[in-house]
Structures are given as structure tokens and as C-alpha cells.
Amino acid sequence: MTVNPDEDHGSAPQQSAPSGAVSGSPPPPAGPAVVAGRAPAKPVRGRERPHQSVAAARRPTQLAARPDSRGQWFESNPLWFKTAVFYEIHLRGFFDGNGDGSGDFLGLEEKLDYLDWLGIDCIWLLPMFASPLRDGGYDISDFKAVHPDYGTIDDVRSFIDAAHQRGIRVIADLVMNHTSSDHPWFVESRSSRDSPKRNWYVWSDDSSRYSEARIIFVDSETSNWSYDEETGAYYWHRFFYHQPDLNYDEPEVQEAMLDVLRFWLDLGLDGFRLDAVPYLYEREGTNCENLPESHEFLKRVRATVDAEYPDRVLLAEANQWPDDVVQYFGDGDECHMAFHFPVMPRMFMSLRREEAAPILEILDRTPGIPDNCQWGLFLRNHDELTLEMVTDEERDYMYSEYAKDPRMKLNLGIRRRLAPLLDNGRDE
């Protein structure tokens, strides 16, 4: 969505408007505003929510600020994410704080009272890092810099502190699998076969390796290998040609990515959505997805986070069937959360057919998970209309019937005891 600096894209809505990109000040609603699936409400600092009297009965006692450098406002609660309401935000399309035509951290901080009024528990930020934006920011050119359209590191720090003061946590997308071809690591890696960072990426003289790995973007890529004329070799990429995969068999890469996590967690982030984690490793004779080595590295990431940054969360983005995704919980020692992609289309199927069978079927096929883990459910997010996890027949049905009536989602609500994720501006 293109931001109009003359429009208020983040103010509190009129009573009947659920969208996160609307205008107006929050009037006292006629009745209590309750978000389905809400966790116990957070203490409100600065001003009272319109529905505060209703939420007060479920609110824990006043939370004490933990005396650390991040200035957090939460008691220790390692399972906070299990009932939290997450709200996805694309910075560019949310609110323009400096009048340059692009949403930014200044604008997001300005609208925190609106987000607090909605009753959310955690903001999930889409990619905010320095990037040439060939793939919406999922092509990162500097893991420790903010895209200049969105602001500065100081702006991020100020926003996180302001969110924490309102009892709102913040997580962000982190792409671990690959970088932009503009990243200095890759620029150095491709400069010479003798480069110190040559082994930071997956290079080969033979483009027939890993032939059993599927091509994800078949409409734009004909191979998972691209030829680099600089050194006369092929580099591996599971996504676009301008997103070379990091080589996690190289210990220096593992250390570098752990350093990236520490950088942002030290800044105050409450966790990450780990993008494209099924593809971290490659092995001949496999489809190069969901490999044991990927799980071992994620366990190392989790152990690092638990030891150094308690109460943070790792959310796995693995667009796979539940039997495969459940592996990303490990024994409660890998990711805290994972998306349940197959539920989303079946929710809409059930509403259109006016029967619960599609939802019940996929839930029956969903394995149990450790007690300290949680599925993340969503009706829509930036991966909306993701119909990979349905049959051909179901896909044809969804193409013809998908969300004709927007009231369907209001009828369903979010009634499972799972962590709901909302997306600003997508519920009109």
C-alpha cells in the first residue's frame, strides 16, 4: 500500500472498523471491545484504553520494570507468546512520520497508542534491514543497518523502548538462509576463488549438484544455480538469483549469524520470525529441505537465545505440512513457535461451505507439540493466498470461492486456543 502523507494510516478506528490503517480518534465504544483469543491485558501507561474497565478484571498486577539496559517492562514469562496477539506491520505502508512518502519508525512510534488501543501484545515487523528491495526487503545487504526509508538505528531503539513502555513486545523478520547479492559478504566472496569469504556461500563448478532440490520460483528461475563470470563458477540460491544462499557448513557463517541475532536482541527486540529456515543446508541425494543439520543449528540458536536473552521468541517460517513443521519445535529446544500454513485456506473453505470438516481434518492431521511451544494461526498475512498446502481440487475450489464475502472472517473470529497473528490493512 502506498502511503499518502496527508492521510492518517495509524489512528484508532471508529467502533465498527477493524482495519489497522484507518483514520479518526478512538471514541468510547458502546460496548466492551474484546479481541478473541486475547492474552491477559497488559498494564497501560499514559492513558486508559476505551475497554480498560473490562480488561482490568483479567489484568495481572502491575508489572515491574526489569533493571536492564533494554528498559523492558515485563515480568519474566517464558511462555508469553502462547496466548499473545501478534500484529504484522509493513513499515513502508503503515504511517509516514517525516513526510517523505514512506512509512517509517517515526510514524510507527507515533501510532503506538492506536496499536495499544487495539489490544495487541506483540508487533511483528516485516524486513526493515538495508536492502536493494528486489524482493521486498528479503534480500538483505546489511544485517546491522536499517533501510534509510525507515529511519536509523536510534529510531528503532526509540520505537522499541516506547512499545515496551506500553507493554507491547516487538519481533522482526530475519532472513537466515541467504543475503542479497549486494551484501559485502557476497561481493567479497565472488571477487576471487581465494577470497577469505569464498566459503561463506555455496559455490560449485558443477551445476548438476543437488538435482533433487525443487525450484521454488518456477515462474522466474530455471535453476537453483547461477553462473558468476567473475570467477567462472556457479553459486547456489533456493530463491531468486540475486539471493545467494549462505553456507552453514562454514563455522564463520554460523558465528556471524549468531552475532546478528545478538546485535538486535541487545537493541531490545523480543525475538524473530526466522524466514526460510527449511533450506539452510544442502546434501546430495536429498531435496535439501528440513535436513537434520538445519535442526541442529536451530537448536544452537535456541540455546544461545535462552542462555543470553530469556523470554525472547523464535518463530519458524516453514511453509510445509504439519508433520514436517512440527520438527522445528524439536523437543521444545528449537523454535518456540511455527506458522500453521494449511489451516488458513481451510478456514475460508469451511466458511464458504458452512461446514467445519476442512478445519477439523487438518487439525486431526496436526501432530502434538511440546508444552512450551505454540502454533501461530493467521487468516491473512503477507503470504496471503498461499495455497501450496492444499490438494489440486481444493486449490481450484479456493480460486473460485476465496473470500467472496469478507464477513466470513468476522463469523469465524479466532476461537482456537492458539496464537493469532493479525495483518494491518488486510481486513477490509
Segments from the language model and where they lie:
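Active-site and adjacent substrate-binding regions of carbohydrate-active enzymes
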Residues: 2-9, 14-19, 23-38, 42-428
